UniProtKB/Swiss-Prot annotation:
One Gene Ontology CC term in the entry: cytoplasm
Family: Belongs to the DTD family.
Quaternary structure and interacting proteins, as annotated: Homodimer.
Free-text note on domains in this protein's UniProt record: A Gly-cisPro motif from one monomer fits into the active site of the other monomer to allow specific chiral rejection of L-amino acids.
Pfam families listed in its UniProt record: Tyr_Deacylase
Family annotation (InterPro entries): Daa-tRNA_deacyls_DTD, DTD-like_sf
Keywords: Cytoplasm, Hydrolase, RNA-binding, tRNA-binding
Gene from which this protein is expressed: dtd
A single GO BP: D-amino acid catabolic process
Location relative to the cell: Cytoplasm
Catalytic reactions on record: glycyl-tRNA(Ala) + H2O = tRNA(Ala) + glycine + H(+); a D-aminoacyl-tRNA + H2O = a tRNA + a D-alpha-amino acid + H(+)
Superkingdom of source: Bacteria
Organism for this UniProt entry: Marinobacter nauticus (strain ATCC 700491 / DSM 11845 / VT8)
Protein purpose: An aminoacyl-tRNA editing enzyme that deacylates mischarged D-aminoacyl-tRNAs. Also deacylates mischarged glycyl-tRNA(Ala), protecting cells against glycine mischarging by AlaRS. Acts via tRNA-based rather than protein-based catalysis; rejects L-amino acids rather than detecting D-amino acids in the active site. By recycling D-aminoacyl-tRNA to D-amino acids and free tRNA molecules, this enzyme counteracts the toxicity associated with the formation of D-aminoacyl-tRNA entities in vivo and helps enforce protein L-homochirality.
Name of the protein described by the UniProt record: D-aminoacyl-tRNA deacylase
Amino acid sequence: MKGLIQRVSEASVAVDGETIARIGPGLLLLLGVERNDTLNEAKELCRKVLSYRVFPDEQGRMNVNVQAAGGSLLVVPQFTLAADTSSGTRPGFSLAAAPELANRLYGDFVAEASGLLGAGRVGTGEFGADMKVALINDGPVTFMLESGQRGSCTKM
């Protein structure tokens, strides 16, 4: 499971021209589910996202997580994060989870985040929909996080 997090001043997601979720300061998470992912990966990545320290402390260093910063989380499903881009000029999606599994694990991730952060601080996109995501990136600060791999957090 992969998550691209971006520290934002605000973010929103719209479907068919209607805004379905909006957050103020916090994290926008684009979530990609891979074919071998399980509930364990969803919970692991959720804990990593919520505890990852990307907000400034009193000295201006990235040392505060979204929970302690009082921020919100907007979770948007994005299957293209599971693409295989290792060859050619066209991505392959054989590593992406089947829609049924991906939707279930997306829901599990959102439920875990809502339980840990509070439902009022978690917004969601719509699985399988053509979404328009708007954000004001703060920094910019963007990281790719992955479950199941030690040391897999990579600065973008």
